[in-house]
Amino acid sequence: MEIEKTNRMNALFEFYAALLTDKQMNYIELYYADDYSLAEIAEESGVSRQAVYDNIKRTEKILEAYEMKLHMYSDYIVRSQIFDDILEKYTDDAFLQEKISILSSIDNRD
């Protein structure tokens, strides 16, 4: 499994997990976050390997569709870069540093 795809799916999952069914969440988490094989997930879930594969592929498309419509992940990346640029440029501005820290903590809430 390629690392870029794994990282992207994990990131999209963090943003959109609440919009998935329990089964979709479970399969994606086991496959991408916990590095289970399709066979291991199938055995644990009592379904065929093909059923797991189909569910994961369908869920990947769903996550990508959410991102295409909502842009939560891409906006987060842009926002983080802007915060980093501001923090780097204005290292002596305590007020600005504090406000950026507050905004960053909002982005990182669970």
From Swiss-Prot:
Q: What does this protein do?
A: Might take part in the signal recognition particle (SRP) pathway. This is inferred from the conservation of its genetic proximity to ftsY/ffh. May be a regulatory protein.
- Record-given protein name: UPF0122 protein SAG0983
So what family is this one in?
Answer: Belongs to the UPF0122 family.
Q: Which organism is it from?
A: Streptococcus agalactiae serotype V (strain ATCC BAA-611 / 2603 V/R)
Source organism, top-level taxon:
Bacteria
Please give the InterPro entries that the UniProt record associates with this protein. Answer: RNA_pol_sigma_r3/r4-like, UPF0122, UPF0122_fam_protein, WH-like_DNA-bd_sf
